[in-house]
From Swiss-Prot:
It is a single-pass type I membrane protein. The gene is FXYD6. The keyword Transmembrane applies. Belongs to the FXYD family. This is FXYD domain-containing ion transport regulator 6. Coiled coil: none annotated. GO terms for biological process: positive regulation of sodium ion export across plasma membrane; potassium ion transport; sodium ion transport. The lineage of its organism: Eukaryota, Metazoa, Chordata, Craniata, Vertebrata. Keywords: Cell membrane, Ion transport, Membrane, Potassium, Potassium transport, Signal, Sodium, Sodium transport, Sodium/potassium transport, Transmembrane, Transmembrane helix, Transport. It comes from Homo sapiens. Regulatory subunit of the sodium/potassium-transporting ATPase which is composed of a catalytic alpha subunit, a non-catalytic beta subunit and an additional regulatory subunit. The regulatory subunit, a member of the FXYD protein family, modulates the enzymatic activity in a tissue- and isoform-specific way by changing affinities of the Na+/K+-ATPase toward Na(+), K(+) or ATP. It is found in: Cell membrane. Pfam families: ATP1G1_PLM_MAT8 (PF02038). Residues 58-95 are cytoplasmic. The chain crosses the membrane at residues 36-57. InterPro entries: FXYD_motif, Ion-transport_regulator_FXYD.
Length: 95
């Protein structure tokens, strides 16, 4: 009787060890599917790139505050006006 019990237990031992190894594989948090992650990242990048190009081409993205449109050389003219305005002001004497 004891011999049969030992024999049955010896048959069950590899099954228990195999199931423990499978559980360890399933619970491994550092096993990643890099191919799926890579494809998902590329799809996400293409979608964001396409949305950005569409926004640029549609010109619907406007500033939140009201600003009158400027001429292309307007920024340079403002800088020149500031320089000439500072040059023409009389120097104040400090006491």
């Amino acid at each position: 009787m004891e011999l049969v019990l030992v024999f049955l237990c010896s048959l069950l031992a590899p099954m228990v060890l195999a199931s423990a190894a499978e559980k360890e594989k399933e619970m491994d948090p550092f096993h990643y599917d890099y191919q799926t992650l890579r494809i998902g990242g590329l799809v996400f990048a293409v979608v964001l790139f396409s949305v950005g190009i569409l926004l640029i081409l549609s010109r619907r993205c406007k500033c939140s505050f009201n600003q009158k449109p400027r001429a292309p050389g307007d920024e340079e003219a403002q800088v020149e006006n500031l320089i000439t305005a500072n040059a023409t002001e009389p120097q104040k004497a400090e006491n």
